[in-house]
Curated annotation (Swiss-Prot):
GO terms for cellular component: extracellular region. May play a role in the development of protective immune responses. It comes from Mycobacterium tuberculosis (strain CDC 1551 / Oshkosh). This is Low molecular weight antigen MTB12. The gene is mtb12. Residues 1-22 form the signal peptide. It is found in: Secreted. Residues 23-48 form a propeptide. It comes from the Bacteria.
C-alpha cells in the first residue's frame, strides 16, 4: 500500500505542476501586452536639416572670368563659354574691334574688383564689379549678373550692357 500511496502522491504532484503550467499559459494566451507611448511635449518643432549654402561663385572665379573677357589677345569667337548663350559671329567681330581699339588707345589693361556677391534667381548671382584702367579717372562700378550653366558665366543682358558702356 505504501507503493500505491507513493504513486498517488507522485500523480498528485504532477497534476499540480501541470495545472500550474496550464494556468500560466492561459494568462499568456490572453494576447500580447501593448504598451502605449504617452507624449511628453506638445508643439515642439522637429529639428530640420541645416540650410544648404547658396550656390554663389567666389570673387576669384568672377575676376578670372572678367579678365578672360577683357583679354585682347584672345578673339571673342573663342570666348563663347564666358557669356550666357554664347557669342555670335557679328557680336564677336564688334567686340574684337572695340577691344583692339581700346588697346590701341591705351585704355587697357583693365583691372576688376568683385564685391557683394549675392545669390539671385535659381542658378544665378549678382555682384558689384568695379573696373579701373589707365584712362579711367576713378573706378566704374556696375551691378552685374552671372549665371551658372555648368560653370559661371556673364549673363547675356549684363554682357550687352557692358559692351554698350565700353562703346561710350
Amino acid at each position: 500500500m505504501k507503493m500505491v500511496k507513493s504513486i498517488a502522491a507522485g500523480l498528485t504532484a504532477a497534476a499540480a505542476i501541470g495545472a500550474a503550467a496550464a494556468g500560466v499559459t492561459s494568462i499568456m494566451a490572453g494576447g500580447p501586452v501593448v504598451y502605449q507611448m504617452q507624449p511628453v511635449v506638445f508643439g515642439a518643432p522637429l529639428p530640420l536639416d541645416p540650410a544648404s549654402a547658396p550656390d554663389v561663385p567666389t570673387a576669384a572665379q568672377l575676376t578670372s572670368l572678367l579678365n578672360s573677357l577683357a583679354d585682347p589677345n584672345v578673339s571673342f569667337a573663342n570666348k563663347g563659354s564666358l557669356v550666357e548663350g554664347g557669342i555670335g559671329g557679328t557680336e564677336a567681330r564688334i567686340a574684337d574691334h572695340k577691344l583692339k581699339k581700346a588697346a590701341e588707345h591705351g585704355d587697357l589693361p583693365l583691372s576688376f574688383s568683385v564685391t557683394n556677391i549675392q545669390p539671385a534667381a535659381a542658378g544665378s548671382a549678382t555682384a558689384d564689379v568695379s573696373v579701373s584702367g589707365p584712362k579711367l579717372s576713378s573706378p566704374v562700378t556696375r551691378n552685374v549678373t552671372f549665371v551658372n550653366q555648368g560653370g559661371w558665366m556673364l549673363s547675356r543682358a549684363s554682357a550687352m550692357e557692358l559692351l554698350q558702356a565700353a562703346g561710350n
